[in-house]
């Protein structure tokens, strides 16, 4: 047992006659032992009187003016953690508070899942590094930086490689190097003709290509395979397509390497402000801007192009339209998965119309 307070440890039956009118004088070493918070309590004592409730007489004597009860200000053995108690379960993400509990429980080492290293290969003859003087036809590589930030946010360790030109042998060698050095490899396709053929051919020749194209939009051209028992994902070059492939395919993969499951996004019910058409062939993810009007959410679809980067920046959430559904009419209640907090959404002014820089300035001032 240990002391829960700074004070003195003593036998409670020696204090029963103490009161405001009858102060009792106790002697150190004979009646009590000075203790600090956390100190072990000798077996002959059964309570602790706080230092605030003592009157110091001299170095070896104190007065008490109220009685104490057994176990007063004492933390019994096992109050916090008992022997063989489970402190944290397996496949649990260690939080700062868990570290304290583990050490308090006498655990100084434990086995953990290794953070997966994720190799990121940007490809394309037209792709150039940020800061490069641009020529006609050049495209700045920003996808690989976005991927790196996402991988890090999800608990992985990103390893970004230099841009690889559209050449089978160059891509093959880059993939071989990345497979050797990482647990997962992401190949980000360029937009030039034949680009996907190089990626799929390399995966097929070095390992096995399981999937080339899925029925989601954006994100249709995704490729999935394995080389040397390591997952290889070919990610479309369009940024919105790339985002949803990362969210829907790569994120769960990175989490699985850590023994974790992805958490479901918060869902709110919102009324669609305008008609939203969809192809019958694909399960579609539609970015929306949310407003909170009259105690209800309203959702306005944003630009739906796969290359519309700002639609991701501006989106408060997204709705999903299943395959075989042609679209959703205005006024329909839909489920929206949130990308922004509800507090932010509820404090957003809703303006629907053509873009005006004044709106951006006002929004920045109000932010």
Predicted regions and their residues:
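Phosphate-interaction motifs
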Residues: 1-108, 269, 285, 321, ...
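Flexible glycine/proline-rich
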Residues: 3, 81, 204-351, 359
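Short coil/turn connectors at secondary-structure junctions
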Residues: 5, 29-31, 43-46, 51, ...
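Short glycine-rich anion-binding loops that position phosphate/pyrophosphate groups of nucleotides
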Residues: 39-40, 125-126, 190-196, 237
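Short glycine-rich, flexible loops that bind phosphorylated cofactors or substrates
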Residues: 42, 96, 193-195, 343
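Phosphate-binding glycine-rich loops and their immediate beta-loop-alpha structural context
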Residues: 79-187, 348-367
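Short Gly/Thr/Asp-enriched flexible loops that form oxyanion-binding sites at enzyme active sites
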Residues: 194-206
